[in-house]
Structure formats: structure tokens, C-alpha cells
Amino acid sequence: FNEHVRKELEKIDENLDIDIYRDGLTIYTTIDSKIQGILEESFEKHIQKNQEILNKEFLADPGKLSRAIEGTNFDKDEVIEILSNNKDIPKELRDKFLVQGAIVAIDPQNGNILGMIGGRQEKEYLNLHGFNRATQAKRQPGSIFKPFIYMTALENGYTPTTQLLNQPLVIFIDDTTRWNPQNHDGSTGLLTTLRYGLKKSLNLISVRIVQELITPRQVVKKAKSFNLSTRIAPVNAIALGVSDVIPIEITSAYGVIANKGIYNEPISITHIEDQHGRVIKRFVSEQIEVIDESTNYIMLDMMKDVIDSGTGSKIRWKYKFNAPMAGKTGTTNNKTDAWFIGFTPQIVIGVWVGVDDPSISLGKRQFGSVAALPIFADAITDIYEWGSFNSGSKIIYLDNKENWAAPNGIVEVKICKETFDRAHDKWCKSTTEIYLENHIPSKNCQKHINAFTKYKE
């Protein structure tokens, strides 16, 4: 974090006509030391577990091991000795053998960076002036990109109960190339709602949204409005998150969803004082609405399901974190990148785990829910147990019952659990769904009314 602040200061010293190294300035940062410590503790605990899993993967696959040491001065026996005993990874091997990661914690209401980790923290790996993966790494996001797919569909008039077929499809890239996307577990199904598709991170539903409801270019436009600086390619595979993102930027984008659709640029400095104690510069993040509050609320509500009963539910049943929360798991093809980003009304935390060489798999079972989520879960649990944090000059008190309030324009409707049409009070098994007031379903459930009529006859 300190290195990130130094680089930020170097960007502004010429504009302020100051010398950050000689003028005796006092720099006030956004960091909360307690949150930073919690992030470091959770990161170190779980990154070592991920390292041990990767070591075993290499040991179980001699071909993978041989390919990874090509061009190095190490022979296979030397590397096997290192991995078998979980020894420190030598510098020459770290690009392919060392599990790395990044964490960013942000106050979504003002953009203050509360904590940051840009790589391994152990003494033998720590490089204070090196590559900060939180702010510099460009990695495939996988399924954590899917909220941009779904919110684009919501903005185009579709709803949480819009149904698409959870079946394989073939997409022709050109005359000779076909793409056959699959769900991560190879499963298929019948008509599936958008809410369920996001909750279970079904690739086939995400792909069909892009094929049948919206276009890749619409998704790119939406994602770029959240200030993602990397190139997002308008291709069919955008549905599965194939274009690189930077951890701090995608975490900040999730902060928009936590903050009623309003974007705050991440900031690391609150103000600067000269040697006489005079404030010479204050930093305030500009607030920009990038998605309508009501549409954002529906997106938020769908992402809460990910935590309550979807791919992120381990936070509930294993880690016993019960505060209102939303988020998304992410895993890339071949498990090269594992992500989890989660948020409450007060804080958003993004976690990325991977190897610097993006061709190296973390392991066959290293999904985002396995490799990244535990880092988040331990951190958020400890932060809420602590009960508060400092954000600029304010103390934010954490309430594990504080939830997001529905804005104007949101309507609750009883729908049939089977047909997803308006429920008949007496004959349908119903549930409550939320809609924008101008997209309320108009069709009544005919299946159960007709069945009742037939029964009477």
C-alpha cells in the first residue's frame, strides 16, 4: 500500500509544485491499520494452503512439472525436493511455481481504500518496490464479470424471471471454428431464470443472454462505464469473462452495486499537510451514477442469492457470517485464476489468487469458492467482529443487521414457483419476486387455474 501511495504522490507533486521527498510533508492516507492487519493475516493463512495444493499438483503431474522448469537452471529432482517439503520457492521458479494473490478493501460510499495487498507478504517473497498485483495485474475475471452481462439484460427490459434454456449450444466463430460452451460441472437443464442462472453461475445462461437478449457491444459499453481501463473485447466469449481486468478496478466496480449505482474512484490519500500543518491538498472521489438505482437494486438482490444459496454460500454455512451481503465467485478456464468479490453496505473486498504465469493452473478443484473465498470469509468475519473501521475522518460502525433499502420504482409481486407468472393465491405455490414498476409480469398463471377448472369439471 505504501508503494501505491508513493506512486500516487509522484503523479501529483508537479501539479502542486512540491517535492514529496524534501518538503517535510505529512501524508494522511485512507488505510485502516486494523483492516490491513486482518487482510494480511487471512491472506498469509490461506495462500500457503493454496501453495501446498499447487505443489501437490506439480508432483502428481510430471509432464506439467517438466514443462514448467524448461529454460531454468533447475533439474526435476531439485524441484521435486523443494515441492515435496514445501520449501521456499527460489526466485528463478516463482513465475510458474509460486501462488500469488491480491486483496483490496474499499469503502464503497466514498472510494477510500481501507486495505491492500499486492502479493506474497512473507519476508523471502516480499518486494516493497515491486509489482503490485492489486493495482497492476491484468487477469481474466471469469465469472466475476457476469454481473455486467446480467445488468445489461436488466437495463434492456429483462427481469430476474426471464427464462432461457440451460442446454448446450454451438456458436460458429468462423467457417472452421466452433465454440461449445459448457457449465463448469457439465450440467444441463430446462428453462432457467436469470436469477437462478447467476446464483449458480451457469455459463450456458450467461452465453444465451449474450446470444439471445443483448449484444457483446452493449456489455462492453456497460462495463466501461464502471471505469474498467483494460480492453474489453466485444466477442461472444465476453459472457464468460475472457478479457483481462485489474483487481482494484473490478472491486471498485462491485462497490457501485453496493452503493446504489454510484461510482467512486478509489483513493488512497485523504489530504496532504505542509511542514507548518497547513492543508495543501484534499482528495475527494467524484461520484458518478453509472446505473439507475432501481435497476442496480435488482442486480444487488440477485447477487445476494449467490451468497445465501448459490456458489458463495460457503460464507453462510461454513464461516457463519450472517450479515446482509452480496457477491460473486469467479474461476477461469483451467483454474488459472480464482476470484471472490463480496460486499456489505459498508465495505467491499476483492480477492484474486493465481500464479504470475497465466498458463499455470492452481489445481483441478481450485475454484474461486475454494481458493479465494476463504481469504475473504475470514477477513470479513474478523472485520465485523472488530465492529468498526476508520474511513477518512469518520468512524464507520458495522451493524450485521444493516441491509439495503429498496428504492422507489421497485415492486414486489407474488409469482408461481413453477411458471414464474403471476400467482393465483389459492392454487399456486408462490414466492415473491421484485421487478421494476414498468416491467411487472402481466400474465397470470394458467397452468394451475386450468388444472383447478379441469378438476371441478
What are these regions (language model features)?
Residues E124, L128, R139, L154, ...:
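Proteins synthesized as precursors that undergo proteolytic processing into mature forms
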Residues R6, E10, E14, E40, ...:
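Sec-exported extracytoplasmic/periplasmic mature domains
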Residues T176-N183, L213-S252, G261, P266-S268:
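Mid-domain, small-residue-enriched loop/turn segments at the edges of structured enzyme/sensor domains
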Residues T29, S33-E52, K56-D107, G115-I117, ...:
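A penicillin-recognizing enzyme superfamily signal
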Residues Y158-V219, Y263, Q275-D305:
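Conserved catalytic neighborhood of penicillin-recognizing serine enzymes
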Residues F1-N50, E57-K64, I209-Q211, K221-S225, ...:
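Non-catalytic, structured segments within soluble enzyme domains
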Residues N132-D175, S309, T381:
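Active-site rim segments in enzyme catalytic domains, especially the processed small/beta chain
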